[in-house]
């Protein structure tokens, strides 16, 4: 499933802007509500999650065992038999919960994606304004960097899943949803400066990809976190400053937001 990426449309901006002496002025806006998690039914042949407590514990044992083995042995070396042995269950029992090893890894990926999405929504709850965009950007990078560091033990699994056909689709869906969230979060400031909806979407896409590029290989130590967070913030701040400066060029206003 592909997530339909929104543009920074005029309707969503009206409540946060006003026209004063021929200029669009950005006003404070209400906090954004969390967006719906964008991944649905992306895992082929997914088994129903059990409701009995004992079965839920067994399922969790399998996921934890797969995660530990992937960290210690490498994702490509793991088999269902190894996962079952680590879980202290019969191999046949493992197959009652998951079709194969990749189905287990996909479940771990989705757990990570759910946590990623919750962290992103929390960090992008307050739309940008002229006075707050720097602190908002700093807060986002700080929170996302911390998330990546805390989930570093899963990174080999995440990269593996995203190399598969289904995983590539899931990754693209998350990326599109991330850009859409940025359109709601950062977009009103750029729209108030006169950028079109398409231009706004392009800027938000550039910001998302710039930040994402700093985490693409994972974050494994606090030192890496500090270094990557600084370069991510420096790079995106420079982009925003350039875009806002260029937006100072005169634009015609005809009574409607442009």
Language-model segments: residues:
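Helix-turn-helix
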Residues: 61, 69-103, 107
